[in-house]
C-alpha cells in the first residue's frame, strides 16, 4: 500500500511540472522537431518573435537558421523598435537593417510591430507587481498565435536574455520599452534609464511578460524555443561590441512554459564549468535577473518546476530547482 502511495505522489508531482524538451544538436531542422514535440496546434496567423540583431552583431539567430520553422509554420517574423540609439531605433533605419541582415531576402515576411508609434495600444496587466499596463505596437493585433524564438545569452541590463526578456522588452514598443525600463515612470526613452532600481526594472519585465503570454493563450496559443548557442555575457543589442562567447554551445530547448524554459537554461549554465560561467552567473545575480523569473511565476504564466526531457535519448531527466545548486553556491564552488 505504501508503495502505491509513493508512486501516486511521484506521478502527481511529475504531472504538476512543465515539460521542457532538450536536444544538444543545434540545426535548423531541429527547430521544427522541437516545436513538434510540444504537440501544440497554433491557430490563425503565426508570429515568430525574433531579435533582428543590432548593426555589427555576429551572434543573433540568423533568418537562414530559422528558415525551416518559418516555412513549417507559415509564420511571419515579428520585431519591435528599440529605446536606445542605433539602427533599430527608428522604423526607417530598422528596415534598412532588416535588409542588411537578410530578414527580407527571398520575400520573407518580417513585420516591425510598432512601425507607427502613434498606433500603439496597451494591454492590462493583472495583479501587477510594478506596472499595471504594457505598451505594445499596433501590429500585435495582426497575429493570433506566436512562437518566441530566443537566443539565450547574457544581458547587460537584465542579467540574461531568454524567453521572458523577449516577452517583455522584446514585445514592447519603443514607448513600452521606456515604460518597463523606468518601471512605469515614463514613456520617453530619453528619460527611461535614470535611477530605476534593478528590482523594480526586473519586476516590470515579469509583469509585462505575463500580459503577452495571457494575450496569446486567450487567442491561438504560444510556444517558446530557446537556443543556447554563442553564449556571450552581452545581448545581441550590443552589436559588434558584444564580447566573444566563453561558454560552449549547449543545445535547443522548447516548452509551452516561458518560466520553465528560462529556469532550465539557467540551471544548465549553473552546472557548466566553462571559463565564462562565473562571470555570467555573477552578472545575473548582480542585476537581479532571477527576479524576472520569480515575478513571472507569481503571475501564474509558468512554473520553475519542470521535467527536462532529452529527446536525443527520449529520457525524462526529471529535474527541478530543488535538485539544483543555487547561484551563490555555484559562484562559490566555481572559485574553489
Give residue ranges: language-model regions.
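A general, composition-driven signal for non-globular sequence regions
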Residues: 7-10, 43
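Bacterial Sec-dependent signal peptides at the C-terminal "C-region" and cleavage site
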Residues: 9-18
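Sec-dependent signal peptide recognition
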Residues: 1-7
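Extended, low-polarity segments enriched in aliphatic/aromatic residues
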Residues: 17-72, 76-336
Amino acid at each position: 500500500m505504501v508503495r502505491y502511495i509513493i508512486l501516486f505522489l511521484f506521478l502527481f508531482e511529475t504531472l504538476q511540472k512543465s515539460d521542457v524538451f532538450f536536444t544538444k544538436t543545434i540545426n535548423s531542422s531541429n527547430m521544427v522537431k522541437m516545436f513538434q514535440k510540444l504537440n501544440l496546434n497554433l491557430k490563425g496567423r503565426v508570429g515568430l518573435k525574433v531579435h533582428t540583431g543590432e548593426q555589427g552583431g555576429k551572434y543573433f539567430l540568423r533568418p537562414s537558421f530559422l528558415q525551416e520553422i518559418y516555412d513549417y509554420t507559415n509564420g511571419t517574423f515579428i520585431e519591435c523598435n528599440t529605446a536606445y540609439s542605433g539602427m533599430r531605433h527608428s522604423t526607417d533605419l530598422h528596415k534598412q537593417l532588416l535588409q542588411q541582415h537578410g530578414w527580407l531576402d527571398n520575400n520573407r515576411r518580417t513585420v516591425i510591430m510598432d512601425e507607427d508609434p502613434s498606433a500603439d495600444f496597451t494591454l492590462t496587466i493583472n495583479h501587477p507587481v510594478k506596472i499595471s499596463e504594457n505598451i505594445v505596437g499596433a501590429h500585435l493585433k495582426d497575429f493570433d498565435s506566436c512562437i518566441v524564438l530566443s537566443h539565450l545569452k547574457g544581458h547587460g541590463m537584465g542579467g540574461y536574455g531568454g524567453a521572458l526578456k523577449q516577452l517583455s522588452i522584446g514585445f514592447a514598443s519603443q514607448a513600452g520599452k521606456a515604460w518597463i525600463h523606468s518601471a512605469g515612470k515614463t514613456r520617453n526613452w530619453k528619460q527611461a534609464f535614470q535611477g530605476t532600481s534593478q528590482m523594480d526594472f526586473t519586476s516590470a519585465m515579469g509583469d509585462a511578460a505575463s500580459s503577452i503570454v495571457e494575450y496569446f493563450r486567450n487567442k491561438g496559443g504560444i510556444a517558446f524555443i530557446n537556443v543556447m548557442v554563442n553564449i556571450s555575457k552581452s545581448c545581441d543589442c550590443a552589436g559588434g561590441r558584444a564580447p566573444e562567447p566563453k561558454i560552449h554551445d549547449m543545445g535547443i530547448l522548447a516548452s509551452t512554459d516561458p518560466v520553465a524554459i528560462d529556469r532550465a537554461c539557467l540551471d544548465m549554465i549553473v552546472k557548466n564549468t566553462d571559463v565564462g560561467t562565473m562571470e555570467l552567473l555573477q552578472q545575473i545575480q548582480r542585476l537581479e535577473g532571477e527576479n524576472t523569473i520569480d515575478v513571472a511565476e507569481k503571475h501564474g504564466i509558468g512554473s520553475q518546476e519542470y521535467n527536462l526531457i532529452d529527446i536525443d535519448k527520449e529520457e525524462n531527466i526529471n529535474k527541478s530547482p530543488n535538485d539544483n545548486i543555487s547561484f551563490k553556491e555555484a559562484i562559490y564552488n566555481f572559485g574553489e
